[in-house]
């Protein structure tokens, strides 16, 4: 699933191609990808609208069109990109926004989990997930104190807490694992058990990991592409995610993959000791995107500078 760095990269690559453009027509090939309003109203209301700006909130893209906001959620495999009308149409193409310069803003989605909400002038139709998002981890408002307050008293694992979009917006499986490795905290640790020093270290690691991933334009395994159709470059810098069986870049201990918060979770059993009394369910390691090749830029925990 595209996480904050991938969605931010899509936003940055779409802005120069879309902002200022007028929608001539909306072609809806798969009506189920339109969540609000009904597809016919959706297409009619957007005809003639101009893209004023594109913003991001967590994993959501927000297209501002005058008093209206078009919300896009890519979920597992959604892909928003701009191309010319002559470009071949992919098999899983669902929505096409025809622009006044002849270009097309296309939405493709192999698994069909993503889609669109068109909000009314008063915010009508806002998806609950967007309305309940926690703080942006790269914003000034996200401080160690804010993170500590949101983790306090929570008995879930710290991995589950980081995946909870109502606590912190934008983190997913990849960067939760990377941030916890950077902070030397086991993913199964009880969230409320972290010490002030550990919370501060985790806060810094979340920000460093995300900033580096944004700089590297996100992580591509198979489906993710940016708004121009390009892959992200972060894969070879991942320290633990998708590295099961490979040596830890710090101590050489083989990286393990287990189930935490019902998600495949990667960690170093030496750098991130298993909490006492916690039983872990192993997960089968799959070959990495490049055949489980050795990573190019292994960095020890706490770096990502």
Swiss-Prot record:
Keyword set includes Zinc: yes
SUPFAM superfamilies attached to this UniProt entry: Glucocorticoid receptor-like (DNA-binding domain), N-terminal domain of MutM-like DNA repair proteins, S13-like H2TH domain
Binding site for DNA: 92, 111, 154
Domain of life: Bacteria
GO molecular function term, any single one: zinc ion binding
Gene3D superfamilies in the cross-refs: 1.10.8.50, MutM-like, N-terminal
Active site positions, chain numbering: 2 (schiff-base intermediate with dna), 3 (proton donor), 59 (proton donor), 263 (proton donor)
GO biological process: base-excision repair
EC number(s) on file: 3.2.2.23, 4.2.99.18
Keywords recorded for this protein, A-Z: DNA damage, DNA repair, DNA-binding, Glycosidase, Hydrolase, Lyase, Metal-binding, Multifunctional enzyme, Zinc, Zinc-finger
Catalysed reaction equations from the record: Hydrolysis of DNA containing ring-opened 7-methylguanine residues, releasing 2,6-diamino-4-hydroxy-5-(N-methyl)formamidopyrimidine; 2'-deoxyribonucleotide-(2'-deoxyribose 5'-phosphate)-2'-deoxyribonucleotide-DNA = a 3'-end 2'-deoxyribonucleotide-(2,3-dehydro-2,3-deoxyribose 5'-phosphate)-DNA + a 5'-end 5'-phospho-2'-deoxyribonucleoside-DNA + H(+)
Region annotation Disordered: where it falls in the sequence: 282-305
DNA damage recorded as keyword: yes
Coiled coil: none
Zinc finger regions, FPG-type: 239-273
Pfam families: Fapy_DNA_glyco, H2TH, zf-FPG_IleRS
UniProt remark on cofactor binding: Binds 1 zinc ion per subunit.
Description of how the protein assembles with itself and partners: Monomer.
HAMAP family: Fapy_DNA_glycosyl (MF_00103)
Functional summary from the UniProt entry: Involved in base excision repair of DNA damaged by oxidation or by mutagenic agents. Acts as a DNA glycosylase that recognizes and removes damaged bases. Has a preference for oxidized purines, such as 7,8-dihydro-8-oxoguanine (8-oxoG). Has AP (apurinic/apyrimidinic) lyase activity and introduces nicks in the DNA strand. Cleaves the DNA backbone by beta-delta elimination to generate a single-strand break at the site of the removed base with both 3'- and 5'-phosphates.
Recorded family membership: Belongs to the FPG family.
Protein name as annotated: Formamidopyrimidine-DNA glycosylase
Species for this entry: Symbiobacterium thermophilum (strain DSM 24528 / JCM 14929 / IAM 14863 / T)
Gene name, Swiss-Prot/TrEMBL: mutM
